[in-house]
Amino acid sequence: MIIKTPSPNFVDDPAYIDRFLNECWVGRRVNSPHIVRFIEPPQNRRCLYCVTEYVQGPTLREWMNDNPLPTPADVRNLIQQIAIGLRALHRLEMVHQDLKPENVLIARDGTVKIIDLGAVRIRGIEEIDVPWGQDGCLGTESYAAPECLEGDRATPASDRYSLAVIAYELLTGQLPYAKPPRPSVRRRLRYRSIREFNPDLPVWLDACLQRSVSLRPESRYPSLSEFLRDLGHPNPALTPTEWRPLVDRVPPENWRFIAVVSLVLNGLLIWLVWMNGVD
């Protein structure tokens, strides 16, 4: 077991204390093998703390550092387990809001567990006048959905966006956009194909991820089950069939290589023509 207490550095921060209490409350009500288990504390406790199970294993971030090139099958296994945990929250009308590799643990038996429930938004809590409910985006910028960065309330669609960003990063080691999708830069952002970083990945998988990290919530998958289905099987409705210019299909670094080769070949051709003229 692990006993978790509030940090003494934030004892005077009402929002922090509210989030701590929120985590304890949520943790005791969610029942899923893929969310860290909270244990009911004694009724006569004299200080503020919560008790959770001890999960021996790395965070997903640490696992990613040790496994920079996982197979698509390994990625699907991890994402599916996280999705089961998210589904348990969503069925209780809760949204995690801060899903990221640092908030996921992998137990020694391979079981994946979501942790850090302090930012979980519960439907109706915003009606209560508490500091926690007045906070803006509680998620980490690189994984937070664009609508949350704009100040909108997080929804299950926001969690699905964060999950898809994690899937993208597992497959490529990169994020789908060059910068976090803040309102000031959203119009200039372009989705980066997973094939730019790993050409061996299939087109249909790229199409799945492109839809799941759309900057518009209404364009994303409406459910976790549909996302998981397309993450494991080609969806003909998504696979791009329209013609795209060659300049859009070839990664920028390949164009640099082509330019260098072309320059060398042109130089060789000029030299051969000059040599023939001399003869």
Where are the regions that the model predicts?
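Activation segment signature within eukaryotic-like protein kinase domains
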Residues: 78-79
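Activation-segment/catalytic-loop signature of the eukaryotic protein kinase fold
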Residues: 41
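Conserved short submotifs of the Hanks-type protein kinase catalytic core
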Residues: 45-59, 63
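C-terminal lobe helix-coil module of Hanks-type protein kinase domains
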Residues: 140-239
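Protein kinase catalytic-loop region centered on the HRD/HxD motif
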Residues: 84-94
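Glycine-rich ATP phosphate-binding loop
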Residues: 1-7
